Swiss-Prot record:
PROSITE patterns: ADENYLOSUCCIN_SYN_1, ADENYLOSUCCIN_SYN_2. It comes from Pelagibacter ubique (strain HTCC1062). Plays an important role in the de novo pathway of purine nucleotide biosynthesis. Catalyzes the first committed step in the biosynthesis of AMP from IMP. It comes from the Bacteria. Its EC number is 6.3.4.4. Belongs to the adenylosuccinate synthetase family. HAMAP family: Adenylosucc_synth (MF_00011). This is Adenylosuccinate synthetase. Mg(2+) binds at D13, G40. Homodimer.
């Protein structure tokens, strides 16, 4: 029995959906452990497209148990809407195949509004959030004033918790000249949907312990990417949760010894959505080509992604931070038309060479990438399923990438289709 954690090794949008879908087919249990509905997966199964934001990818598979862990912040209205959306496509979501941690924190309307207010006020200094209330909800969690799923069970307790959290938020809203939130109205709205949320609520840590004893395969599904981690990412241009593999333990209530393999999803080039440092960003025709061929638009926001060359220095760093055992290299086929391909192998900062990304954002913004150039292969890799059938220059690029980052490539994706994958190592069977 092996348990696998999937994380993004860059800034998110690495193509986790396809890989997670393939792994979830082999897993018994699939668990989301951090983030909210600010990041999404697009799955295509038997010609049907599913866009998931909160629900784990296992939900579209029969005989799988899908779980939202305590580390996730949940917008209850968005969750119910997503459930109805996939139900309309024939997917079953019931108390037998879906569980929400009773300790998960809720995103409420004033969180969304606060997110928007801050982003609008920040001007050029904005973070580039999805304006869905994720950050403010995590702030309330850390501030010990949050409302959790379990609080929906008691009207008296909910009233008290709302009073506490609104004391904080309404004080800020008054200072900003905004209308205050009415406690009774919000309580009424929450009590109205409470039964639909509570029927899925369980102590997730206890269920995971049972699954481990039953030798079930567990897939921990990360959202976003390591470079957006609140501690280890390009702070302050990060998300509000820990996106590294170790967050799977804290975000679900299982010990770190429950993790046996960490798979880092890694794009063959680099993208970033929103603001923040991006050493290898391309603003020329090549950047546009990568964006066009890679269809680089966000699943949740439809925002255009910034594109650039593969940054080996960054990926090598995230591999060390997250304890990645192997990478799934995605979107190799996007590079098919290029005459030459570059890989960042070092940085220069104020005339000095560096082999890692410094922590200070001021330094990150000044960094100059140093590249190694590889000849392109100028032929299609799309649909190839055996590494020996790849063009020689494509293989050379992969081997050089693997050697530089110091971690094996466990699979290579050669198109958005699930079947178009070169499998070199199955994380569940290592």
């Amino acid at each position: 029995m092996k348990n696998v954690v999937v994380v993004g090794s860059q800034w998110g949008d690495e193509g986790k959906g396809k890989i997670v879908d393939w792994l979830s087919d082999q897993a018994d249990v699939v668990i989301r452990f951090q983030g909210g509905h600010n990041a999404g997966h697009t799955l295509v199964i038997d010609g049907t497209t599913y866009k998931l934001r909160l629900l784990p990818s296992g939900i579209v598979r029969k005989n799988k148990i899908s779980i939202i862990g305590n580390g996730v912040v949940v917008d209850p209205w968005a969750l119910l809407e997503e459930i109805e959306e996939i139900k309309s496509k024939g997917v079953e979501v019931n108390v037998d195949n879906f569980i929400i941690s009773e300790s998960a924190n809720l995103i409420l309307p004033f969180h969304r509004e606060m997110d928007e207010i801050r982003e609008d006020a920040a001007g050029k200094g904005k973070i580039g959030t999805t304006r869905r209330g994720i950050g403010p909800a995590y702030e309330d969690k850390v501030g010990r004033r949050s409302i959790r799923v379990m609080d929906l069970r008691s009207e008296t307790n909910l009233d008290h918790r709302l009073e506490t959290v609104l004391l904080h938020h309404n004080a800020i809203r008054k200072g900003l000249g905004k209308k205050i939130f009415e406690k009774d109205k919000l309580k009424e709205e929450l009590l109205k949907i409470a039964p639909e949320i509570l029927k899925f609520s369980q102590p997730v840590w206890l269920r995971i312990d049972e699954f481990k004893k039953q030798k079930k395969r567990i897939l921990f599904e990360g959202a976003q990417g390591i470079l957006l981690d609140v501690d280890h990412g390009t702070y302050p241009f990060v998300t509000s949760s820990n996106t590294v593999a170790s967050a799977a333990a804290t975000g679900t209530g299982c010990g770190p010894n429950s993790i046996h393999y960490v798979l880092g999803i890694t794009k063959a080039y680099t993208t970033r959505v929103g603001e923040g440092p991006f050493p290898t960003e391309l603003t020329d025709d090549i950047g546009e080509l990568l964006g066009s061929r890679g269809k680089e638009f966000g699943t949740v926001t439809s925002r255009k992604r910034r594109c650039g060359w593969f940054d080996g220095v960054l990926v090598r760093q995230t591999i060390k931070i997250s304890g990645i055992d192997g990478i799934a290299l995605t979107k190799l086929d996007v590079l098919d038309e290029l005459d030459e391909i570059k890989m960042c192998v070092e940085y220069e900062l104020d005339g000095k060479k560096m082999d890692y990304l410094p922590a200070a954002v001021e330094d990150q913004l000044k960094i100059k990438p140093i590249y190694k150039t590889f000849p392109g292969w100028k032929s299609s890799t799309q649909g190839i399923k055996n590494i020996e059938n790849l063009p020689e220059n494509a293989k050379n690029y992969i081997y050089a990438l693997e050697d530089f980052i110091g971690t094996k490539v466990s699979s290579i994706s050669t198109s958005p289709e699930r079947e178009d994958t070169i499998l070199l190592e199955n994380p569940f069977e290592v």
